[in-house]
Amino acid sequence: MAKIHELSEILANQIAAGEVVERPASVVKELVENSIDAGAKQIDIIIEDAGLKSIQIIDDGNGIEAEDVETAFKRHATSKIIDRKDLFKVHTLGFRGEALPSIASVSDVVMETAVSGRAGTKIHIKGGEVLEKTLSASREGTTITVSDLFYNTPARLKYLKSVQTELSYISDIVNRLALSHTDVALSLTNNGRQLLQSAGNGNLQQTIGAIYGVQNARQMIKFEDANLDFKISGYTSLPKLTRASRNYISLLVNGRYVKNFQLTKAVIEGYGSKLMTGRYPITVLSIELDPTLVDVNVHPTKQEIKISKEDELVTFIQKTIFERIGQENLIPDGLQNIKSKTKEKLDFEQLKVGLNEASKQYQTKQHRTGITSEVTAALFGEKLTKDESQTQTNEKIKEETKVELSPIIIKDKQDLKSDRVKEWDEKYQSRNKETEVTSIAEKNGSVDDKRKDTPRFPTLRYIGQMHGTFLFAEGEEGLYIVDQHAAQERVKYEYYREEIGKVSPTQQNLLVPIVLTYPTTDALIIDENIDKLKELGIYLEDFGQNTYIIRQHPTWFKEGQEESIIREMIDYFLKDRKLSIAKFREKTAIMMSCKRSIKANHHLDDKQAKSILEQLKTCENPFNCPHGRPVLVKLSNKDLEHMFKRIQDPHHTGILEED
């Protein structure tokens, strides 16, 4: 009797479902992608109990012809490719023909679909078997309902996470789909509670606001660039807005959300030393390239891809983000943390209006799962944008709020036109208009004329030092507080980065050579990278089994720390044996700058302090130390005037009553 036999189609589909359908989020992803491929512009995702009970996808796409409905649930049946050539130039999200049969084999599926001008079709499939197929009075588009997921695969059902965890996975993938297809209006509802509603108007910035919150969207800047092979665009957050996970970086390749470690790493490295260790930006990166340069047929989920010329793309992304971030003045607002604790709910409502009305419409306070967050003013205080919609909001506040401003007494509206009120407004409001935050479109778009005229780093005049740790300086826009250690660390980092790259032949001979001994495993790695050490001026001579002797060192070493510096440099290769020369130089420069910089409680004279400020101004990046900490913060003139009540809130022009 033959031992090898062909598996039944239902069993084969259930096996395939192990890769295609991992959890309810996989079902949502596959079905929504089918809707997008069908030309849908409105897709409603309605789930119960995070998809464990039911998942319903309703779209207004092209629908499926009656004669194709049953065929669509057969393995490798698709309308998206025909021959081998199509496989290497895929323009659709799906093409393998595995999703529908895999889903139907492990659940109870009911689908109603219709094409324009024709009667609809309803089909009911459970466990891969067709139970019913009838005509139906359906509108154009498709409605598919999946219930009892994994009812016949108890092992898979057993290892699903909690309802909240599964809901977060669904929310995450829907967010990514909304970001990659901004022209499609997506809504997600769980147990009657709406979690997301995107506008579907093609505005990426607005979609980001709907997902991450309007305040976060305000702190993201637009970037775009193109060369012969690639076109990249998107939004990325300023260094002050970060997260503890790389999960907030969304990579979109030809409209497909993908995961790629090298591209994610390129985004992070584009920030250089502007990010704190362990912190990551919020980024939406869209990459457009010829489909022949990318292979999406790597895994059934199609989230893992292979890209030709990946190294060139990595360099291109890193360079584009680095240059875009470099255009920004990254001095943080010194009162940001204080403001964040005292902001009232009213300020948050005003801020939401600032992005645009459509963003306000689709902002949802219930969206708390997955990568989304309900942003409140208590977390991200931000200056308000002076746009038309905000002005209308402020006018409403003026009418409702009454504030006593002695000694000016206003009895009626005519008194608002008095000379004293005009004099007050001219004195305390006219100059503030010059420092208003620009609109979000200007802020996140190309640099406007006003910003081009503003120097990237201010001219500072030294005032004094506090506790041997902070330097105080004044500039045209206000008071600046400088962390003296972080400032000198930045200056020395850029100095050592350049010096280490020179590899001067001049060496300092050691009176007593340094002898280093390592275990065999470490010695093998050191031998593998010994040429890289030579490029930085570290010459290790063989001095017996697993032992090395150093007789000289570069002149930029700090006296008395020669052995510790060399050991630390060698440790870099022991931790990462594939460390590149460029990364090695950067790590060494960071180490040297930290070791040779002044510390806290170190009192400086005026000449030394002024020298640090002058050197800081010449730095390529004067805003952060090599570890990402801020070098200085600013208290603007307006902030100081607010603190001393020299200017009042915008609603001070309300009608007042005389006692």
Swiss-Prot record:
Superkingdom in the source lineage: Bacteria
InterPro entries assigned to the protein according to its UniProt record, in alphabetical order: DNA_mismatch_repair_CS (IPR014762), DNA_mismatch_repair_MutL (IPR020667), DNA_mismatch_S5_2-like (IPR013507), HATPase_C_sf (IPR036890), MutL/Mlh/PMS (IPR002099), MutL/Mlh/Pms-like (IPR038973), MutL_C (IPR014790), MutL_C_dimsub (IPR042120)
Alphabetized UniProt keyword annotations: DNA damage, DNA repair
PROSITE patterns: DNA_MISMATCH_REPAIR_1
One of the record's GO molecular function terms: mismatched DNA binding
A Gene Ontology term for the protein's cellular component: mismatch repair complex
Transmembrane spans: none
GO biological process: mismatch repair
Database matches in Pfam families: DNA_mis_repair, HATPase_c_3, MutL_C
CDD domains: HATPase_MutL-MLH-PMS-like, MutL_Trans
This protein's record includes keyword DNA damage: yes
Secretion signal span: none
Function: This protein is involved in the repair of mismatches in DNA. It is required for dam-dependent methyl-directed DNA mismatch repair. May act as a 'molecular matchmaker', a protein that promotes the formation of a stable complex between two or more DNA-binding proteins in an ATP-dependent manner without itself being part of a final effector complex.
Family indicated by similarity: Belongs to the DNA mismatch repair MutL/HexB family.
Name assigned to this protein: DNA mismatch repair protein MutL
Organism lineage: Bacteria, Bacillati, Bacillota, Bacilli, Lactobacillales
Gene name of this polypeptide: mutL
